[in-house]
Amino acid sequence: MKRFGILIRGSIILLQIILFANSCLSQGYNHTWLLGYHPNVNNPFDTMAQIDFNISSFSIVNYQRKIPFRGFTQANISDANGNLLMSSNGAWIANSTGDTMMNRSFLGYDSYINANAQGLSLVYANTLIPYPADSSKYVLFHHSTEYDGFSYPVYSINYSVIDITKDGGLGAVDSVQKYVTAIQDTFNCGIAACRHANGRDWWVVAQKHDTDTIYKILFTTNGIASVTTQKLNVPKAWYNVSQLTFSPDGKKFVYQTYIPNQPDSSYILTFDFDRCSGLFTTHNPVFVNRGYIWGLAFSPNSQFVYACTTDKLYQLDLNTNNLDTIATYDGFNSPYTWCCPTTFFNCYLAANGKIYITCGNAIQHIHEINYPDSTGTACDFQQHAIPIDCYHRGSVPNHPNYYLGCDTTQTTCPCLITGFNDVKQHDFKFSISPNPNNGNFKIMYLLPQNSKGILEVFDINGKAIYKQNLPPWSTMQYISLPKLANGVYNCTITSNNEGMHKKLVVFKE
């Protein structure tokens, strides 16, 4: 009997190794976050860090690279296998090695950028998108700014095209299409991007300063096809610092605006978004009278918006418009007991379905929301949960949903080939964790566009013992089957006549 137990444990360990190896293959375009900068500018090789996400977890690697992220600006993109291709801190563009990209990648066309090569202190000041229908090219949209005597408004939205096939696969900035001015006006800080309903083109948006007007760029296979504006009929954005953010399903949009005549007050502004027409529809603004809203992020299921002030984290339920206080800063300092406060700043919905929150100070910890699809404190917010062993300020990647395809529920915009994420067979990115487990486990998955799914669990005889519907746009579920006996089961996800299965091992001491 003892020998049998050893055999079972050995089999489980072997299966864990196999499952881990498989999960490592579940990488993608938005699976990298670069952290750290050079605290000592005379030592350009200070240790930094990189977080690589798979669909259910992450790994942190500390290493040295040239490009720092001392400010609040970060754009990066990886290939389909999760290999980092390029990044930008708003001042310059780096290749996959972290060194300067070929062909004058420095974005130094104004004095502010020239003086901040370690990274711009502007939130969401750039973003990277794939060039429509051209898998060899990418487009970096980025800000330019100058001090106006009060703050740093943005004076243009620019873009640069990168050809990843140049310089032996390290990429190069296009010699003609670099620092191209898309729009010249006065803007607030922040750029957001969302895939068009046709599944190929992109919307890129930014706020006009001291107004309620939003600019919308439609970027197609021929470059900029149109630039339009829309009045949103909301409190005007005045020297705004906001994470302009689209929901994972592309149907909602959020930003915050500061109210200058009401100190420490903000509005959270939410909208419906039509990916075909580019039109925004305004919801009722949510007033927050307890501080300036810094960070914003949607939950994976697009139902909740998380918003944070310096010392408070809120959850806004878009189904009810109810604002709930999730947490208050607990007073923890990093990296020393006397410095520095790990307060709240920018939010980031990562590829593993969790939300991470940075701090505006130079600290060595980040916060984590483990279950952002859950209501209230069940979201499980853990302050300073993750040590990163390097100094990092507030920057998080400005990743649009690269996996958002054609909206097949509408007939106005025909589906077009993207050349970026078109596959004949759907990749469900299905994972189970922990595995083995005691009957309580988490599944992560990616359903086909606008489609619901079904989870089924079968015993070794092929008998279905559990079945659950999976809503469209959901990506994570917590399953509790405490009555399952020890053994090996088959878990299957199906949608649109396609499916994927994983082995589930139940083992109770």
Describe these PLM feature segments:
Residues 17, 67, 131, 150, ...:
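Sterically constrained small-residue positions within well-ordered secondary structures
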Residues 27-273, 277-420:
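Beta-propeller fold recognition
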Residues 1-31, 292-294, 304-305, 420-423, ...:
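Bacterial Sec-dependent N-terminal signal peptides
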Residues 22, 155, 200, 264-266, ...:
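Residue-level signal for beta-strand positions within conserved beta-sheet cores that form or flank
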Residues 425-433, 437-509:
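C-terminal outer-membrane/trafficking sorting elements
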